[in-house]
UniProtKB/Swiss-Prot annotation:
Matches recorded under NCBIfam families: aroA
Residues binding 3-phosphoshikimate: 23-24, 28, 168, 170, 316, 343
Function: Catalyzes the transfer of the enolpyruvyl moiety of phosphoenolpyruvate (PEP) to the 5-hydroxyl of shikimate-3-phosphate (S3P) to produce enolpyruvyl shikimate-3-phosphate and inorganic phosphate.
Protein name: 3-phosphoshikimate 1-carboxyvinyltransferase
Family indicated by similarity: Belongs to the EPSP synthase family.
Source taxon at top rank: Bacteria
Length: 429
């Protein structure tokens, strides 16, 4: 378990950062390229541990995948060309891999067994396995399909019209991917619109997808045709530096190539509402996945209320939003964020516990947290508990604190941002 010491930053964070590739899009590009017909080239791929787990799983099913830096080539096998894996498919720490891949495996006539690390073993799978069973897939797991390892034997599926109890892009995507070979029209309706990378990318691969309000539909029997994918920078990774630029005195950061998919930009809306000073320069208007360069500088923030439809658009950014709120004048209330409890850690409990160690005034609620600003943070020993987003949030907190912060289990950040600490060090000079 590696630890990392973060010293206070005296002269602010300044400079340019090129944000690494979007994790969600990188996963999907490999998966969709694998089940497409033809050769797909992916540029800007994120070489984090999670996305490498996706590559490993599809290689295990006979897909030819080669990687050269951030460029990946996938020679697709088509929906019917995947081979039965000889070994257990290990997704590591990646919830995206196991949930989306389950939708693909539900289509396959062969047997597969899927597992991950200790964190994955605690995460709820029934939200995916239940609808896939309704479609006709044979899926089982611990506690009646609630937890990994999962065993899957797919086959002939029937389309369903599924009303999802949660706004989850992973649940929606698993069902849509299963629907590609299902008989009939598969439809998923959510309580709020979740991120739509799957819909956008399926369309890029030639699949017709219909969107009607909170419902997404596709007809079975459609094939994917290989295409080239340009992956923009991950706005969830950018979020840590957006907040850092806003709350660390004497800072000015230029973040290049930040993905601006409107289902993911809740962090931008929240920072704007809190009073952050930034400019956005679009760089690829008209692309399937829009991107921009963002300049942000030290700002005076105020507390706000966050809840409702915006939550699915910023669910992964809530840990660092909570940090921003500790440096805002007034009270910030975050609600409707039950999904935080089933992430890599229970992020409500983890955020509250670790920021409290640093002197923040913050309370957990059943569906979020209440943060009382403005707090002077102090040095202490904290822990990521294997959660990459907690680790990065604590590192930004360390730049502000009076005294050094020691982060235990700091290597967890490699899941989504392998060069994070190098970037932070460079900007602090």
């Amino acid at each position: 378990m590696k630890e990392r010491t973060i010293q206070p930053v005296n002269n602010g964070l300044n400079g340019n950062i090129t944000i690494p590739g979007d994790k969600s899009i990188s996963h999907r590009a490999v998966m969709f390229g694998s089940i497409a017909e033809g050769k797909t080239t992916i540029k800007g791929f994120l070489s984090g541990a999670d996305c490498l787990s996706t590559i490993s799983c599809f290689k295990e099913m006979g897909v030819e995948i080669t990687q050269n830096g951030d460029e990946v080539t996938v020679v697709g096998k088509g929906l019917e060309g995947l081979q039965e894996p000889k070994a257990v498919l290990d997704v590591g720490n990646s919830g995206t891999t196991i949930r989306l891949m389950s939708g693909i495996l539900a289509n396959t006539p062969f047997f597969s067994c899927v597992q991950g690390d200790e964190s994955i073993a605690k995460r709820p799978m029934k939200r995916v396995t239940n609808p896939l069973k309704q479609m006709g897939a044979n899926i089982d797991g611990r506690e009646e399909g609630t937890f990994t390892p999962l065993t899957i034997r797919g086959g002939d599926l029937k389309a369903i019209e599924y009303i999802s109890p949660v706004a989850s892009a992973q649940v929606k995507s698993a069902i849509l991917l299963a629907g590609l070979r299902a008989e009939g029209v598969t439809a998923v309706t959510e309580p709020h619109i979740s991120r739509d990378h799957t819909e956008r990318m399926l369309e890029a691969f030639g699949v017709k997808v219909t969107r009607e309000g909170k419902t997404v539909k596709l007809s079975g029997g459609q094939k994917l045709t290989a295409t080239d994918i340009q992956v923009p920078g991950d706005v969830s990774s950018a979020a840590f530096f957006l907040v850092a630029g806003a709350i660390i005195p004497n800072s000015k950061l230029i973040l290049q190539n930040v993905g601006m998919n409107p289902t993911r930009t809740g962090i931008i809306d929240v920072l704007e509402k809190m009073g952050a000073t930034f400019t956005i320069e679009p760089i690829n208007e008209g692309a399937s996945e829009p991107a921009a360069n963002i300049t942000i500088e030290t700002s005076s923030l105020k507390g706000i209320e966050i809840g409702g439809d915006i939550i699915p658009r910023l669910i992964d950014e809530i840990p660092v939003i909570a940090l921003a709120a500790t440096q805002a004048e007034g009270i910030t209330v975050i609600r409707d964020a039950h999904e935080l409890k089933v992430k890599e850690t229970n992020r409500i409990d983890t955020v509250v516990a670790e920021l409290t160690k640093l002197g923040a005034r913050i309370e957990a609620t059943d569906d979020g947290m209440i943060i009382y600003g403005k707090s002077a943070l102090k040095g202490n020993t904290v822990n990521s508990y294997g959660d990459h987003r907690i680790g990065m949030m604590l590192a930004i907190a360390g730049c502000l604190a009076e005294g050094k912060i020691i982060i235990e289990d700091a290597e967890a950040v490699g899941v989504s941002y392998p060069t994070f600490f190098d970037e932070l060090q460079k900007l602090a000079k």
